[in-house]
Structures are given as structure tokens and as C-alpha cells.
């Protein structure tokens, strides 16, 4: 009887390990960025897997860009600047994509903190840009002139009371070491890797308008 129970235990552990391995992301999001342009996307992933010049809803914005592997776990959004791929993003609860730095959808805030090897700062929750990283505070995810990480965490209350949630909500910045944020420990819901560029004057005006329209009214 003991041998049977022991065998069952090994079987269950083995099955759990196998499922865990299968569920981990396997595709490198940085390789999409490295495609360079639309032709590069088609060359790497095939014309049937790429939809060019389409509308993409991301957060509270609707932008023009490309989608690869639409409607599948491999879906990723690709955006361009002057004909070149400028940024690539994934959003939702899960995806097969991960960044070369180790980020993937569903990863907890505390795990992201470990990857960054430092605390970082996020915006307060409960508004259009809630739960977004404001600064990596010089950590490993801070990026450089060639690559930057932009991420947002689940922008909803969890593991804390409504009154406690109000204390970490709104248009304010919070260190992720805040006790209530640590208690929430939200998961990544959006990841973007981008090549920094200087926007044109008109692009700058458009960005300013979007930011202004998303601000919380002062009461």
C-alpha cells in the first residue's frame, strides 16, 4: 500500500512539473522587435500570421499598427515609427511571449521586483493609467538608449479592503515596497518593449492631449 501511495505521489508531482513547464512562455518578444519593419515581420512569421495597418485597442487608446498571430496565445501588437518597428506589446492574463529580461504576463509584482533587483515606482490604481511603472529607479529593467520596458499591473483591487485600496489609488506615485501594494501583489497585464525615439512636434502634441484627457479631475 505504501509503495502504491509513493508511486502516486511521484506521478502527481511529475504531472504538476510537466504542466508548469508547458504553461511557461517560450517565445522571445525581443525577436519581434528585431524584425525591423513590416517586411521583416512577414519574412519571419509568414504573411498569413501578420495583419498590417489595423486598429489596435490598448488601454484607453486606439492606435494603428500590426498584429501577429491574431486571436491566438501568440498574439502580439506591433507599432511603427517612420516605417520601422518602434515597439511591441502583449496584454491580458497570459501569453506565450516573454522578454529577454524575463518578463511575461501574469508575473507578480514581487517577482518583477526581483528581476529589477531593486524597488521601483508605479502610478496609483483605479484610473486610466493605474498600476503602470513610472520609474525603474535605476534597476536592471531601466533600459538604455536602445531598449526600454513599459509595463502595467492589474489595475483592480485584490487582497485588501476598499478603504485600503483608496490609499494606493489615484494620480499619485507609490514605491512598490508600500505594505498595501505588497499585499495586493498584482500581476503584469501589459508589457511593452520599445526602441526610444524623439517624437515630432505634432506627435508630442498628440501625446500631451492623451495624457491630459486621462488625468483625474481635481476636486
Show the residue positions of the predicted features.
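Sec-dependent N-terminal signal peptides
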Residues: 4-13
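Short helix/turn-capping signatures at newly exposed starts of structured segments
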Residues: 16-129, 133-138, 143-147, 154-219
Amino acid at each position: 500500500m505504501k509503495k502504491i501511495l509513493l508511486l502516486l505521489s511521484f506521478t502527481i508531482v511529475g504531472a504538476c512539473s510537466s504542466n508548469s513547464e508547458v504553461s511557461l512562455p517560450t517565445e522571445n518578444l525581443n525577436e519581434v522587435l528585431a524584425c525591423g519593419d513590416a517586411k521583416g515581420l512577414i519574412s519571419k512569421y509568414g504573411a498569413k500570421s501578420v495583419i498590417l495597418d489595423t486598429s489596435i485597442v490598448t488601454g484607453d487608446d486606439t492606435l494603428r499598427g500590426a498584429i501577429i498571430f491574431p486571436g491566438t496565445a501568440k498574439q502580439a501588437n506591433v507599432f511603427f515609427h517612420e516605417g520601422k518597428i518602434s515597439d511591441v506589446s502583449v496584454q491580458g492574463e497570459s501569453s506565450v511571449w516573454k522578454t529577454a529580461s524575463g518578463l511575461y504576463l501574469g508575473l507578480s509584482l514581487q517577482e518583477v521586483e526581483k528581476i529589477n533587483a531593486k524597488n521601483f515606482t508605479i502610478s496609483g490604481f483605479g484610473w486610466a493609467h493605474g498600476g503602470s511603472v513610472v520609474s525603474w529607479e535605476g534597476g536592471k529593467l531601466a533600459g538604455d538608449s536602445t531598449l526600454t520596458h513599459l509595463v502595467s499591473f492589474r489595475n483592480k483591487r485584490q487582497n485588501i479592503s476598499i478603504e485600503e485600496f483608496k490609499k494606493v489609488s489615484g494620480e499619485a506615485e507609490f514605491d512598490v515596497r508600500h505594505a498595501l501594494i505588497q499585499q495586493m501583489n498584482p500581476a503584469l497585464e501589459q508589457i511593452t518593449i520599445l526602441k526610444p525615439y524623439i517624437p515630432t512636434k505634432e506627435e508630442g502634441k498628440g501625446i500631451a492631449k492623451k495624457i491630459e484627457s486621462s488625468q483625474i479631475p481635481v476636486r
